[in-house]
A protein has these predicted regions:
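Active-site regions of enzymes building and remodeling cell-envelope glycoconjugates
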Residues: 64-76, 103-104, 196-199, 218
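RNA substrate-binding interface of SAM-dependent RNA methyltransferases
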Residues: 101-184
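Active-site/ligand-binding-proximal alpha/beta "capping" segment
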Residues: 180-227
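Short acidic-hydrophobic, aromatic-tinged amphipathic segments that line or gate anion-handling sites
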Residues: 8-11, 70-73, 158-165, 221
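Glycine/small-residue-rich loop that forms an oxyanion/phosphate-binding "nest" at active or ligand-binding sites
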Residues: 69-97
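Short beta->alpha connector loops at strand-helix junctions that form conserved
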Residues: 72-73, 109, 135-136, 158, ...
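Boundary-proximal intrinsically disordered activation/regulatory segments immediately upstream
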Residues: 3-59, 138-139
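Structured adenosyl-cofactor binding patch, chiefly the S-adenosyl-L-methionine
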Residues: 126-127, 146-154, 211-247
Length: 247
């Protein structure tokens, strides 16, 4: 009878482990077309959506999926993880493939906070947005804080990174109605005429949407609210807008 020897990675000096650790850096993620996820929930979401390349589990963990699997010791997980309390399950994922743009589009101009981007992605899935287009100056989609904030919803929606000055005119030529959030005026989101094909543009946390981007839009919109409140967090505002558009 042949003895099967199970490989368990225990050294943080191992080249394979070092290369996995490098996926915490954007430059290496872009080079490899891969990114890291941490925790069982995210791993299961990635697996369900055919994005999981490799499962990484702590030795003697009974969790299993039909995918390439690495068993590692706790010190290796702690070395790889970005969390204070490392998870016992991690994964290496393929970066998302860009799909055809759907009829309901959310465009983000310069959103910088990882938590905001993650929350916006969750809201977009909740309110049936087909496609999210990130401007090139947005925070990296595969930033670990963004990924955790999405709670796995990044695997359930088409997300592209584009030059907005090139992409918005293309959408206009395809008969999308281009709407933009604008603190300086426009139409109440509750009163606008809805189109089957639309793109809504939301801007940076501090500066809002760039003026040159606003000039590319068909209509400015705002959320009517108590005059004592000057503004809302971008993730909160986006959630309200997407809810109204989904009615």
């Amino acid at each position: 009878m042949k003895m099967v020897i199970k490989m368990i990675y225990s050294s943080i000096s191992n080249d394979k482990i070092k290369n996995i650790k490098k996926l915490n850096d954007k430059k290496y993620r872009d080079l490899e077309g891969l990114f890291l996820i941490e925790g069982e929930h995210l791993v299961l979401e990635a697996y369900k959506n055919n994005c999981l390349k490799t499962l990484i589990i702590e030795e003697n963990n009974s969790f299993s999926l039909d995918v390439d699997t690495m068993e590692v010791t706790s010190n290796v997980l702690k070395y790889i993880s970005k969390l204070d309390s490392y998870p016992k399950i991690m994964g290496i994922c393929y970066k998302k493939k860009e799909l055809e743009i759907g009829n309901k589009v959310l465009i983000l101009d310069g959103v910088q906070d990882p938590g905001n981007l993650g929350t916006i992605i969750r809201s977009a899935v909740a309110f049936n947005i087909d496609t999210i287009i990130l401007g090139e100056d947005c925070v990296d989609l595969y930033n670990s804080k963004v990924i955790r904030s999405t709670q796995g919803m990044l695997f359930n929606i088409n997300i592209l990174v584009k030059n907005l000055f090139e992409e918005i005119p293309k959408l206009k030529n395809l008969d999308y109605k281009i709407m933009v959030t604008n603190l300086n005026g426009g139409n109440d989101i509750k009163t606008i005429e809805k189109n089957d094909k639309f793109a809504i543009i939301v801007g940076n946390e501090g500066q809002g949407v760039k003026k040159d981007i606003i000039n590319l839009s068909d209509e400015s919109i705002y959320i009517n609210m108590n005059s004592k409140c000057e503004s809302l967090n971008v993730a909160v505002a986006t959630g309200i807008i997407l809810y109204e558009l989904d009615k």
